């Protein structure tokens, strides 16, 4: 799959949480190797770790369908280069960048991106960062969280990735466990073909192929909490696990608000085997699981970049020039446009659960729903637009 169109959808890779610490190099490109990851959770100049800049070099406009993964120097450059080949635009949030949402003073505010990828954070998120991440997802962003095995504390700050993510989920000011996911504290090395049977799932059966195997080389599983978020779903499980249960999950998804989440428990999966010359890296992206990891990660990002209520090709369409009224409303919400066109309207609750999906209309009733916040997706064959609706 290769799209030569000018990319409009932007994917941001995090490098603010010491993702380059120790023998990890979970960055897409670095021109310098001068960072030091410290035991007080800070990252400073004065060491030998990768220092990824905002825009990878050489420029991504030079990437073609045959560009190799070592075109850039980073342990997950293969993933990023494949995303560029698909038509996306990729950036890094550098070590001194800020994780914010709707902060106009930050040129890399999350509102400017469709997907945010965090590959094995080694330092915890602040309270404001947690809120930014949750609000980013709630308002339509896609969040990809890659963890690693318990005890992988690469910067000696007494935090490993499972602890960092669980702290994010369960100690924030917005909602306890918003995505319905928690990481276990395990260290697992094994292969599994226990993939759920769902031919309609675009991650498991997507543009890059069918996922049939996922290998862990020191990873951890997840437990799902559907009482916290009924939209959480396990796609890949441990070999002997019940793949309809909430335990022993290797790859999970969730929907929160009008945004989406993917989570996987092993950072060896996106590792392409080359990067920081001072690290020993292993090819889990292309080689392990007979190429299934590449299929899984690419299909997953495409799903994340597709808004809830939309098909995978809808996201490439422009935003519709429409509005809604009244908002807040106690009964009906109407589409306001300069034409007499009808639209497909999808109404969701705050967890992302679809409440109504109505074709060929310009209004939708919210009369029977309790007061609160809802999300409305308006689309037709020309494009789409998302709205937050308040029921009064």
Each predicted region: which residue ranges?
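Low-complexity, Pro/Thr/Ser/Gly/Ala-rich linker/spacer regions in secreted
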Residues: 2-8, 305-320
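Aromatic-Pro/Gly-enriched surface loop or interdomain linker
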Residues: 4-112, 298-305
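Active-site-proximal beta-strand/loop segments in catalytic clefts of secreted hydrolases
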Residues: 14-17, 93-97, 118-122, 146-151, ...
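A conserved amphipathic helix/loop scaffold
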Residues: 19, 27, 71-77, 257, ...
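Short, flexible/disordered intra-domain loops and linkers
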Residues: 23-28, 59-70, 152-162, 274-288
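Helical hinge/lid and interdomain linker segments adjacent to catalytic or ligand-binding clefts
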Residues: 64-166, 171
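An acidic, glycine-rich "communication" segment
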Residues: 149-256
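C-terminal outer-membrane/trafficking sorting elements
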Residues: 315-392
């Amino acid at each position: 799959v290769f799209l030569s169109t000018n990319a409009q959808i932007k994917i941001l890779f995090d490098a603010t949480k010491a993702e380059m610490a120790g023998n990890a190099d979970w960055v897409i490109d670095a021109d310098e190797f001068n960072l030091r990851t410290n035991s007080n959770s800070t990252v400073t100049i004065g060491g030998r770790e990768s220092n990824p800049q905002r825009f990878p070099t050489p420029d991504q406009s030079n990437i073609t369908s045959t560009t190799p993964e070592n075109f850039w120097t980073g342990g997950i450059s293969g993933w990023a280069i494949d995303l560029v080949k698909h038509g996306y635009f990729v950036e890094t949030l550098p070590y001194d960048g800020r994780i914010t949402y709707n902060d106009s003073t930050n040129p890399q505010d999350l509102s400017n991106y469709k997907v945010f990828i965090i590959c094995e954070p080694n330092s915890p998120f602040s309270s404001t960062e947690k809120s930014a991440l949750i609000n980013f997802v709630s308002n339509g962003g896609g969040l990809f969280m890659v963890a690693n095995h318990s005890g992988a504390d690469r910067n000696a700050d007494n935090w490993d990735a499972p602890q960092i993510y669980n702290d994010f989920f369960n100690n924030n000011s917005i909602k306890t466990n918003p995505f319905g996911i928690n990481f276990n504290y395990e260290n697992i090395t094994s292969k599994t073909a226990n993939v759920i049977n769902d031919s309609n799932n675009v991650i498991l059966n997507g543009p890059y192929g069918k996922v049939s195997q996922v290998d862990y080389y020191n990873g951890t599983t997840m437990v799902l909490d559907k009482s916290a978020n009924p939209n959480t779903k396990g796609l890949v499980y441990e070999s002997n696990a019940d793949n309809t249960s909430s335990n022993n999950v290797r790859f999970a998804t969730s929907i929160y608000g009008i945004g989406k989440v993917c989570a996987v428990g092993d950072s060896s999966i996106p590792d392409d085997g080359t990067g920081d010359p001072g690290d020993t890296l292993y090819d889990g992206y292309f080689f392990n699981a007979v190429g299934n990891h590449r299929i899984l990660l690419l299909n997953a990002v495409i799903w994340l970049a597709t808004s809830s209520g939309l098909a995978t090709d809808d996201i490439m369409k422009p935003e519709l020039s429409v509005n809604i009224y009244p908002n807040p409303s106690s009964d009906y919400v109407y589409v306001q446009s300069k034409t007499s066109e009808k639209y497909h309207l999808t109404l969701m609750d705050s967890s992302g659960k679809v409440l109504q999906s109505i074709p060929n209309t310009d209004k939708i009733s919210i009369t029977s729903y309790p007061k609160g916040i809802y999300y409305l997706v308006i689309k037709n064959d020309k494009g789409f637009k998302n709205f937050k609706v308040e029921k009064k």
